[in-house]
Design a protein with these regions (language model features):
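Residue-level signal for functionally critical sites in structured catalytic/ligand-binding pockets
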Residues: 28, 37, 58-60, 69-72
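Acidic, Ser/Thr- and proline-rich intrinsically disordered linker/docking segments
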Residues: 49, 66-143
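Generic, low-specificity signal for short hydrophobic/alpha-helical stretches with a mild N-terminal bias
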Residues: 14, 43, 59, 138-140
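Anionic N-terminal interaction surfaces
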Residues: 1-53
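Residue-level recognition of well-ordered secondary-structure positions
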Residues: 21-22, 62, 78
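Conserved beta-hairpin
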Residues: 45-69
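Alpha-helical protein-protein interaction elements
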Residues: 7, 31-32, 64, 104-107
Length: 143
């Protein structure tokens, strides 16, 4: 599948699936499984960062470390912004209250596009990102 087809499938809501070891609820399809680093905001500062396996699905992003498994549904992420091609900042709600996290992963652009498609299709970064992804077949989203 080339980049243009992938972008169109994201717009249509029909995503390609990849094999994953994560047990997914019915109706959820894994799109990517990549390594990454997540930083959580606690109070006034950010933690040291934790290496995680990042699974992006049609409904959420799942972060799995050695000590925990966290699923963030698109409905729980209220705001997102790509800071770099591979760095995504998210703000949302967890079972313990409001939180923020930064996620560095090859799948940051895909994760952002899926979140935006579900929560904020008019996000100001979407048009330029889709245009750049369509023009650059070497983009991580096209792999």
């Amino acid at each position: 599948m080339d980049t243009a087809q992938l972008i169109q499938s994201i717009r249509d809501g029909d995503y390609p699936a990849v094999a994953t070891a994560v047990a997914l609820p019915p109706g959820h399809r894994a799109l990517t499984v990549t390594s990454g680093v997540v930083w959580w905001r606690y109070g006034a500062g950010w933690d040291q960062g934790e290496h995680v396996e990042v699974t992006t699905t049609s409904h959420d992003v799942i972060l799995r470390s050695w000590t925990q498994l966290l699923s963030w549904g698109w409905h729980a992420i209220d705001a997102a912004q790509l800071l770099e091609d591979d760095l995504l900042l998210c703000q949302g709600r967890s079972t313990t209250g409001d939180t923020s996290f930064m996620l560095r992963t090859e799948a940051a652009q895909l994760t952002f596009c899926l979140w935006a498609a579900h929560r904020n299709p008019t996000h100001p970064q979407v048009p330029a990102l889709l245009e750049a992804l369509s023009a650059d077949p070497s983009s991580p989203i096209s792999r």
